[in-house]
Amino acid sequence: MSKNLSIIGAGAWGSALAIALYDNFDTIYLHAHTQDEVKILKPKYSALYPNNIKITCDFSKLQNSKDILIVTPSYAFSEVLEKIKPLISSAHQIAWGTKGFDTTKRCFLYESFERIFPNRNGCVISGPSFAFEVATNKPTALVVASVDKNTRKHFAKLIQTTTIRAYTNADIIGVEIGGSIKNILAIAAGIAAGLGYGINTQAALITRGLAEMSRLGVSLGAKNSTFVGLSGLGDLVLTCSDDLSRNRRFGKELAFNHSIKSALYNIGSTVEGLNTLELILSIANKKQVEMPICEQVYQVTQGKITPTEVVNYLMSREQTNE
């Protein structure tokens, strides 16, 4: 078999990875969701990458690749795994670049993977990475996490390029938590930015948000050290600091007193932080972990408090040790 890669998900992140990785493979099969998407994308890729990137919506093409990378929205993750399961052989290896929780099954993505593929080692690729910068070859560092050493080393080698530096980590729980909670905290950062607060406020939100992320992660068995790495602090700083982040832009829309519906319309794409909010807080409640920033973001999205009241509440909480 030639050295091919199948990427399932032709959105911004899947497309960026295809462009960034095309020199590493003979052929990359970029799987769109529908034939209409194929018709839109095919002329563009045929002109720029005529021999390397093939646009398709035919899952039978998975037979041409040993390695599969899933880059779909988190809500579609389980559905995609179920669809491809009959086509997967022992020769295939699967990783995903999706961040967030499986909200349809109310669990981590790796748990959905283990449920559908019980005898395989899951692998997640995460870290601070705006799709546009990856696609335009800006130097980027990613983390590849799996409980299996060979699996994480395999995918780290596959995605390493002159502009992508891949690190490995055994803590798949911590990496997935970081990639999920940072989206919620970015909404909070967007609210603060939209209200006109300064860098001091942003720094406080990032630092205290990291504490919330770490507390929940450790309660679920993750390593504290993971949260000061690329998938924790790295992705959190990125997502909270720049308007390339959809979640941050969504928070700014809320600060401008736009409704959830109009804010989502203005963003024009998935806001993962909004999708995972309720589930994260449900888990935190069961583990008796305090997450005041995430809780206040949830209250805003439910229309129970205003964006201004979020900051007022957080600043007036009872004093505690750091």
Swiss-Prot record:
Pfam families associated with the record: NAD_Gly3P_dh_C (PF07479), NAD_Gly3P_dh_N (PF01210)
Ligand binding (sn-glycerol 3-phosphate): K99, G127, S129, K182, D235, S245, R246, N247
Binding sites annotated in the UniProt record for NADPH: W13, H33, K99, A131, R246, E272
Superkingdom field: Bacteria
Top-level class of the enzyme under EC nomenclature: oxidoreductase
InterPro entries linked to this entry: 6-PGluconate_DH-like_C_sf, 6PGD_dom2, G3P_DH_NAD-dep, G3P_DH_NAD-dep_C, G3P_DH_NAD-dep_N, NAD(P)-bd_dom_sf
Keyword line: Cytoplasm, Lipid biosynthesis, Lipid metabolism, NAD, NADP, Nucleotide-binding, Oxidoreductase, Phospholipid biosynthesis, Phospholipid metabolism
GO annotation (BP), single: glycerol-3-phosphate biosynthetic process
Reactions this protein catalyses: sn-glycerol 3-phosphate + NAD(+) = dihydroxyacetone phosphate + NADH + H(+); sn-glycerol 3-phosphate + NADP(+) = dihydroxyacetone phosphate + NADPH + H(+)
Location (main, coarse): cytoplasm
NCBIfam families attached to this UniProt entry: PRK00094.1-2, PRK00094.1-4
Free-text function comment from the UniProt entry: Catalyzes the reduction of the glycolytic intermediate dihydroxyacetone phosphate (DHAP) to sn-glycerol 3-phosphate (G3P), the key precursor for phospholipid synthesis.
Sequence similarity: Belongs to the NAD-dependent glycerol-3-phosphate dehydrogenase family.
Name of the molecule in the record: Glycerol-3-phosphate dehydrogenase [NAD(P)+]
Biological source species: Ruthia magnifica subsp. Calyptogena magnifica
Gene from which this protein is expressed: gpsA
